[in-house]
Amino acid sequence: MVVQLKTARLLLQIVDAFIEVWGAGRVGVHLAPRGDSHDMGDADPLATFGYVVEQLDQRNVAFIFTREYEAEDSLQPKLRPKFKGAWIANEKLTPESAKRILATEQADAVAFGLAYIANTDLFERLENDLPLNQVQFDTLYGPSAEGYTDYPVFEQLEA
């Protein structure tokens, strides 16, 4: 418990400061429970993030946005019941995994990052079970509009 307290201290102090200014209903927190980016990690992510989620629930923040891909060892199914507010899932979601996460109530909403970059008509594609454009990874974070504004919408593909 002491480790979780120390690990979460800065985040919770920031959340408390935001709540003081804007109120809990206008504060949300973005979490990456796996903590696996850039060689980061945690000895016990379930304990650490379980504590954080419980603390955020006690503070009545508006939402938690999680970045965690779906896998056998996903923490989201264990963390979600600890929070009464809105839960938004994100990270390498497919249309099928997004629907499954929503159907099993692991999240109240889902978000797409890369899929949206490649499919500006993403909502229509998901709603109508249309195929998705593939992301052109070699164009991401480049200096030009290529790979951001030149993906075809579905009607253009049919023409």
Residue ranges and their predicted role:
Residues 1-159:
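Flavin-dependent oxidoreductase catalytic cores
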